[in-house]
């Protein structure tokens, strides 16, 4: 077990919401090779769509939550999709984006 008091500065981080909202989407929600400095958190309420990373297509559907890490290059699209979204930054005390460099979509 790690004593958190041994590394007080390393245990400090902040989460900020850069943008958030509700969206009812159609086929115009489409982008290739998107890459953002923030992470995206999608709560899918209904419909279906996809996220694509390194040639792998990840179906997205109602009732699930998806995380696209900061600086992750991906594509997306749908025919009909209802979602809540949050664009977030998770920064360490040194202003390093904690989720940057994660190569998978969850």
Task: Label the predicted regions.
Residues 87-89, 103-106:
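Short, intrinsically disordered, charge-balanced linker/junction segments flanking boundaries
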Residues 99:
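Catalytic core of bacterial cyclic-dinucleotide metallophosphodiesterases
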């Amino acid at each position: 077990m790690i004593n958190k008091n041994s590394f007080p500065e390393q245990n400090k981080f902040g989460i900020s919401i850069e943008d958030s909202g509700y969206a009812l989407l159609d086929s115009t929600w489409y982008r290739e090779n998107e890459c953002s400095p923030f992470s995206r958190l999608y709560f899918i309420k209904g419909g279906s769509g996809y996220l694509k990373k390194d040639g792998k297509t990840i179906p997205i559907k109602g009732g699930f939550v998806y995380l696209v890490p900061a600086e992750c290059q991906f594509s997306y699209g749908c025919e009909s999709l209802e979602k809540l979204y949050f664009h977030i930054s998770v920064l360490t005390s040194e202003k390093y984006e904690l989720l940057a460099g994660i190569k998978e979509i969850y």
